[in-house]
Amino acid sequence: MAMGDARTTESARQIAMVCLEELVRGDDRYRRIDEIVGDWGFVREAARPYYSEGVGRPSIDPTVLLKLMIAGALEGIGSMRELLRVADLRLDLRLFLGYGLGERLPAHQTISETQTQRFADGEVFERLFLRTVALCQQHGLLDGTHLSVDGFHAEANAALRSLRASLEPRAAEAEAEPGAGDEAASEPPQLRLAEPRSGPTPKRKATNATAVSRSDPDARLKGKPGQRPHLVHRGQVAVDPKRRCVAGCLAERAEGYEGDALGPLLDRVRFLLPELASVGADQGFAAERVWEDAAERGIIAYIPPQKTMLPRDGRAPRTNAQRLALAARARAKSEAGISAHRLRMADAEGVIAELKNHHGLGRVRCRGTPAFHLQLLLGCAAINLKRLAKHAPTAEQGIAAAPATPAAALSAVSNEPHRDQLRTTIRLGRKQLIWTASPSLN
């Protein structure tokens, strides 16, 4: 074989008429997302209250800003500067944003200001997430009868050295005299240390009751036994086991009881999933009020109780909490309860790992619980869009797709020694498609 001619830079300097749409593959992820979503007009409608009509110069299209944030969540890029460097070089992202080869992308300050200030209340991101859930339901990616719920901790954007002794208002020693109300109202409130000598020092351990972070007051100290504590925020996700789509999410402070988040999560999904019949969670959600609230909603809660909640030595239950704990243990040990437990481990914990490792939820970029909630909404919306790009087009193009196994039917599969033993083969002429009915399907 003869050696080919050497390539020079002359061909790269030539002017050519190219079409950006022809340079991007037809099965590109962002092209498929754009086709599935279709009309992005809901973004402009949700963002309209944040702009002035006819005042000032025209701003950048809010749809472009939101698409850039979606791309950052899909790529797992937290830095806006790095995101714009990547988007400037990639043809698929330029086509997704609607920018030509020679057009300059928005500045990184504009994107940061949009996320942290203009859309800080989260209404636009809530509309985006709800739209992705509705699209998943429209394309048959949601079963809607069972949800797997689990929580996780995301490291806050604050260091331990930012901890300072917390302050609380000083109680009045005596009641104010008549007529002195105006003078007392004008004086600033008197503060004192929450606990004397409670500030963190090298010899004194800080706790949430005695210290607060100056950088992020919403962050809380959490740590496993024997490990160094970290300042974290807590997030909750509700995952549908059919295609592991996220049906609901919630961000909160990492304090109090974890099970109190189950009620707000169910309130968020009750209109999207009216046929919801059961929910599965771990022992961290076990409590009397949680079981009672689920029963009032007509939902079966597969939440195993903790050992301290059960009667000792096999005695009869003496309180209502012990009776509910025994009933919860019976549900957890049933065939459906075992299936719900395995679904939670495979789906909810799998989605949490996906959020942390691939979508930037391992560490909070901004400060405060509301900012973490925006980041969580973007990450969950990115997961749903990724599921849509993978599964929705196959059904629309008429290609035989794997029928998803409902959550209730997976209990028969969960007892097998290997989760991928149940296989079905579909022959399509010369092609052969094999699908696996197991909870590990993406």
Label the model's feature ranges.
Residues 24-70, 75:
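Basic, short loop/linker segments at the boundary and entry of helix-turn-helix/winged-helix-like folds
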Residues 19, 64-70, 110, 114, ...:
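A general alpha-helix detector
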Residues 93-97:
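Short amphipathic alpha-helical interface patches used for protein-protein assembly/oligomerization
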